[in-house]
Design a protein with these regions (language model features):
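Short, conserved SAM-binding/catalytic segment
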Residues: 45-53
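N-terminal Rossmann NAD(P)H-binding glycine-rich loop of SDR-like oxidoreductase domains
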Residues: 8-22
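Helix N-cap at the beta1-alpha1 junction of Rossmann-like dinucleotide-binding domains, i.e.
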Residues: 13, 38-41, 109
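ADP-ribose/adenylate-binding Rossmann-like module
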Residues: 83, 94-112
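C-terminal catalytic/substrate-binding lobe primarily of soluble NAD(P)-dependent oxidoreductases
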Residues: 3, 149-417
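Rossmann-fold NAD(P)-binding glycine/threonine-rich loop
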Residues: 106-127
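Conserved Rossmann-fold cofactor-binding substructure of NAD(P)-dependent oxidoreductases
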Residues: 58-73, 80-83
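Conserved glycine-rich Rossmann-like NAD(P)H-binding loop of the short-chain dehydrogenase/reductase
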Residues: 28-41
Length: 417
């Protein structure tokens, strides 16, 4: 087949950088073309990769001619620039026009729905487009497919994610996404059909791995309840719940997110505030007013005590970074041999000393790299259309892909009860 040219757009972003580094571990016959609006940020990454393997160049993805020239002849185009609600459209359109395969780790509902609307166009163009190929969505979708395969009938699917203390490594696109997840409309699947809830309102407790234990999580606006019904149309309920660790972060993000939703705080100013907090700066007064409102609500709902909040604020004020605990879990219920059965999968470890879940950038980047390996292993022309992970990435092939990009097998998942 010869050397395959792999194009990364938005390559300087933290998650995309991790995807590139982990993908290089698989050691195929690939030429890595790294593009970003600020290519100088890629110099160290290029030096860390095998000599001659990668090149870096400037690209404004909204420059149609420049984008077309960058992706011409690529075996795969990976979009790592967010927020996807603004970036996915032009890149997907360019890939369709050029006839080259596309892959992203989109976690926004609106851009996911737009991508799915392009399915017939992708079929007509003979182009595979793989969306939502990160940790959540992505890894979670594969875990669902794996668990559901043990059942004769799928009735309910619950997806859970919790992200630990990520200070110092969160970009503005991630903060934008987090604010949209924490407040606003939430598309989900209930009683056999799509419904609209309010994000973060409904809560539940679940037992998570990676040192998290029994954790309160909140219903969130995420792509899984939008895409999984395509594979499991007869399921009664498909829900996604998420949260942050330690719990006070939930109050901060929820309080600021509500202010954005109500129009009392501009999104840019809200992101500025959270970005300041994530880099151990004070932020703005308006942000703190809304954040404190969210923190007080945690006490009212029982998610945290006043003592816990005081301790959290005191430690955070002096720049203390809390032990990183990040985890994913899926729980699928239905019938097996005529009997009600629950099948679960969850990630077992996270934090320093781990590979897959060192932090969320590592989890998303490593999962993306594994999906890339699986996609590139397929013969050209195998499929065409827009696909979410549960539709094309067979679980065992994906797990082997994770191993090929360096993940120890015992970090991938365990079976929870």
């Amino acid at each position: 087949m010869g050397t395959q040219r792999i194009v990364f757009i938005g390559a300087a972003g933290e998650m995309c950088r991790l995807a590139i580094e982990r993908f290089a571990v698989a050691d195929g016959d690939w030429e890595l073309a790294l593009y970003d609006i600020r290519p100088e940020l890629l110099e160290q990454l290029v030096r860390r990769l095998p000599p001659g393997r990668a090149s870096a160049a400037r690209l404004d993805l909204y420059d149609r001619e420049g984008l077309r020239a960058a992706i011409e002849g690529a075996a795969l185009v990976v979009l790592g620039a967010g927020p996807y609600i603004r970036t996915a459209g032009p890149v997907m359109a360019a890939c369709l026009e050029a006839g080259v395969p596309y892959l992203d780790f989109d976690d926004d509902i609106e851009s996911t729905l737009h991508a799915l609307s392009l399915h017939e166009d992708a079929v007509a163009a003979g182009v595979p487009m793989y969306i939502g190929c990160g940790a959540s969505p992505g890894f979670t979708n594969v875990l669902v497919a794996d668990a559901a395969a043990e059942l004769d009938r799928v009735d309910n699917i619950d997806v859970y994610w919790v992200v630990g203390d990520e200070r110092g490594s969160i970009g503005r696109a991630v903060l934008d996404h987090m604010l949209r997840v924490a407040a606003g409309p939430c598309m989900t699947w209930e009683n056999g059909g799509p419904v609209l809830h309010q994000s973060w309102v409904e809560t539940r407790w679940t037992e998570l791995g990676a040192g998290l234990g029994l954790t309160m999580v909140h219903e969130t606006a995420h792509p899984e309840p939008v895409t999984l019904p395509r594979k499991y149309p007869d399921a009664k309920n498909i829900r996604c719940f998420g949260g942050l660790d330690p719990a006070p972060y939930n109050g901060i993000v929820r309080g600021v997110g509500l202010a954005v939703q109500k129009g009392t705080m501009p999104m840019v100013k809200a992101i500025d505030f959270l970005e300041a907090l994530m880099t151990n700066k004070f932020g703005n007064v308006q942000g703190w007013r809304n954040a404190l409102s969210g923190l007080r609500n945690l006490v009212r709902t029982g998610e945290a005590t006043r003592t816990e909040l005081i301790k959290f604020v005191a430690l955070a004020a002096v720049g203390h970074t809390f032990p990183h605990k990040t985890g994913l879990k899926v729980e699928v219920t239905g019938l097996r041999n005529g009997l009600p059965t629950t099948v679960s999968r969850r990630t077992p470890v996270s934090g320093p000393g781990t590979y897959l879940f060192t932090d969320m950038a590592a989890a998303t980047g490593t999962a993306c790299a594994a999906f890339m390996v699986v996609a590139l292993d397929e013969q050209p022309g195998t499929r065409a259309g827009v696909f979410t992970p549960e539709e094309w990435a067979e679980p065992e092939r994906f797990y082997k892909g994770l191993e090929r990009v360096g993940t120890p097998r015992d970090e991938i998942f365990d079976v929870s009860h």
